[in-house]
Amino acid sequence: MNNRLTSALLAASLLFALTLASCGTPAAENSTPPTAPPAQGSQVLEADKPTPAETAGTSEDVPSETPAASGSNILVVWFSRVGITPFADGVDAESSASINIRDGELVGNMQYLAEFVAEETGGDLFQIITEQEYPVAYRDTTDLAKVEQNSNARPALASHVENMDQYDGVFLGFPNWWGTLPQAVMTFLEEYDFSGKTIVPFCSHGGSRLGRGPQDIAALCPGAELLDGLAVSGSAVSGAQSDVQAWLDNLKLD
């Protein structure tokens, strides 16, 4: 009797083991491997008119924090609707106001200038990105900018500098919208203490150069030293490197 019971138990155990083995391959083999998160870029890129290079897309395509500290004491900041506006793939740069193409990508004027300034100064790059996207149509953007200015709005920002204390000098690039800084740039300036820092403005414009920009910067950052800025016509940005170089040389930064 005992022998029969033992044999029955062994047979049942063997059948159970075979059933488990036939239930399929391990989950790891059947599941799709998780997609690696996109690498965070060290920069992102504008203007009064967006110019030669920037990927069409939304603000989700843009890093939201300062690049990893490089040891530089110079930060090159810029604001552009390119990078926070959902331009469609294949947008016609020639027929669209303020849009330019470089190496197959959209780029804002301010990104174009900021990258050159960073290259020449060894500064870190940072783009001011708003939580709200801006309209694709340039006229709609300028209309929105006017509404923001009339209400003295402070658009919420999605990008923030985590290590501002590292920087002694800040180059600040912006498009001249309605005679001065975009309201989002004012949000940026009010977010940090610039006391003891040097601010150097540069802008793209459609005829009014820096406008009230320097005065507004001085009012928002009373403890900062403000150096002479550079104004580049939006239609001349792609050929302005010699002008930018001469301006940088004259600044005689430490």
Regions of interest found by a model, annotated:
Residues L18-S22:
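C-terminal motif of bacterial Sec signal peptides marking the signal peptidase cleavage site
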Residues G24-T25, P37, V44-Y167, D249-D254:
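N-terminal beta1-alpha1-beta2 submodule of the flavodoxin-like/Rossmannoid cofactor-binding fold
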Residues L113-E120, D124, G173, F188-Y192, ...:
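Structured segments of extracytoplasmic/periplasmic soluble domains
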Residues E225-D254:
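Glycine-rich phosphate/pyrophosphate-binding loop and the adjoining helix
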